Amino acid sequence: MPELPEVEVVRRGLERWVAHRTVADVEVLHPRAVRRHTAGGEDFAHRLKGRRVGVPSRRGKYLWLPLETTDTAVLAHLGMSGQLLVQPHDCADERHLRIRVRFADALGTELRFVDQRTFGGLSLHDTTPDGLPDVIAHIARDPLDPLFDDAAFHEALRRKRTTVKRALLDQSLISGVGNIYADEALWRARIHYERPTAGFTRPRTAELLGHVRDVMNAALAVGGTSFDSLYVNVNGESGYFDRSLDAYGREGLPCRRCATPMRRRPWMNRSSYFCPKCQRAPRVTV
């Protein structure tokens, strides 16, 4: 599932190719693609027609297109395989094309939502005074947000009394960090994923946040992480941060710091990758 860097890459592409364009027509080709829009596909298409798209926004892994002069926005759920592509009008339809948005201009391109597994979709929502779709107003700011409060995060982290990887994936504490980048940041910080958060000092929290930001910015610089053809940017191009991963997916390979074989452990229906030497497991107290 796309994490913050991948979603931000898509957002930047939409800002370049879709922002400030007026919708001429919307074609909903599969009902599941608008299942979160409870009024249905016809209502979704009708309410978008004639509206001007504002600058795309993002919080964590959530992406939306505000509609200018309204208090509404189109929220994009990419799911496991959703893609927002900007394609020429005459480009052949993708096999799993679900929604087509045509624009009232002569640029010759349209926005397409393509989704092989149909877990994703588009939906229209009212926005809060801060401009967020109301259904995601509870989501915490992400670490690349200029208004992210490091001190408040530290206090919340200690109060949560959980383990550090669970905290990094908790959208009420910090948004946008998924399994891949949590493992990468923890490896860089030399912290075991099961370390309790109650004992974190301010300097340790600051160091961890620094690594989270560094790994996300590094991924952004190369278009994100793509393990298959399902994650692409708006031009259909894959990212290649997977070539630079230090922890995730490297079970049995030597740690890039100490050469100890990396390990993988099942974790919350996912996997955690770590170095048993650099990232010592916390002591178990009885």
UniProtKB/Swiss-Prot annotation:
Statement: the UniProt record of this protein carries the keyword DNA damage: yes
Domain of life per record: Bacteria
Catalytic activity: Hydrolysis of DNA containing ring-opened 7-methylguanine residues, releasing 2,6-diamino-4-hydroxy-5-(N-methyl)formamidopyrimidine; 2'-deoxyribonucleotide-(2'-deoxyribose 5'-phosphate)-2'-deoxyribonucleotide-DNA = a 3'-end 2'-deoxyribonucleotide-(2,3-dehydro-2,3-deoxyribose 5'-phosphate)-DNA + a 5'-end 5'-phospho-2'-deoxyribonucleoside-DNA + H(+)
Binding site for DNA: H96, R117, K160
GO biological process: base-excision repair
CDD domains: EcFpg-like_N (cd08966)
Subunit organization: Monomer.
Protein name, as recorded: Formamidopyrimidine-DNA glycosylase
Species of provenance: Streptomyces avermitilis (strain ATCC 31267 / DSM 46492 / JCM 5070 / NBRC 14893 / NCIMB 12804 / NRRL 8165 / MA-4680)
Lineage, highest ranks first: Bacteria, Bacillati, Actinomycetota, Actinomycetes, Kitasatosporales
